[in-house]
C-alpha cells in the first residue's frame, strides 16, 4: 500500500526529504559508535569511567539529533524511512587518544553531511530547512569538533598512549570535571 501524501507538506523537495533521512541514519550511526566507545571504556580491564561517561553523553546527544530530524520530517510532511545502522568500524578502541581521534573524524563527517544538506536546502529554496540546520546543528558541530581537537592535542602533549598515566590523569582531571560546569 502506497504511503498517502501529507496534507501539511509545503515547499519540501523530495531530495531534501531523502537527505534528511540519510542524516537521521548518520546521526544514529554516530550514536551507536559513541555507545560502543562508552562501554569499551567501562570495561573492567580499561576502567576509565569518565571516558565512558563522556562518550555515553555524546551517544545520547547524537540520538537526540536524530530524533529532532525525525520530528522535523513529520512537521514538514515528509516520510521517515529508517535504514540499517552500520556497525562501528571497530570493537576495540585501544586507548583514549585513538577513541578521541576517531570521534573527531566522526564529527567532521557528520558536520560535512550537515553542510551538504544545508547546500541542498539552499539549492531547493527551502529557507525553513536551512534555518533549522543553522539553529540546531551547525554551531554545535563546530564546538564539538573544537572540543575533540583540544582533547586530542592534550592527550598527545601528555604522552598518550605511550604513558598510561596520561590517560588516567586526563580521565580524572579533564573529563572528570567536564560535568561540573
Curated annotation (Swiss-Prot):
It catalyses: 4 Fe(2+) + O2 + 4 H(+) = 4 Fe(3+) + 2 H2O. GO terms for molecular function: ferric iron binding; ferrous iron binding; ferroxidase activity; RNA binding. One of its GO terms (cellular component) is autophagosome. Belongs to the ferritin family. Fe cation 2 binds at residues 62, 107, 141. Pfam families: Ferritin. This is Ferritin heavy chain. Its EC number is 1.16.3.1. The keyword RNA-binding applies. Residues 10-159 form the Ferritin-like diiron domain. Stores iron in a soluble, non-toxic, readily available form. Important for iron homeostasis. Has ferroxidase activity. Iron is taken up in the ferrous form and deposited as ferric hydroxides after oxidation. Also plays a role in delivery of iron to cells. Mediates iron uptake in capsule cells of the developing kidney. Delivery to lysosomes is mediated by the cargo receptor NCOA4 for autophagic degradation and release of iron. Inhibits translation of various mRNA species in vitro. Associates with a 35S prosome-like particle that contains non-translated mRNAs in a complex with proteins. May be involved in pre-translational regulation of some mRNA.
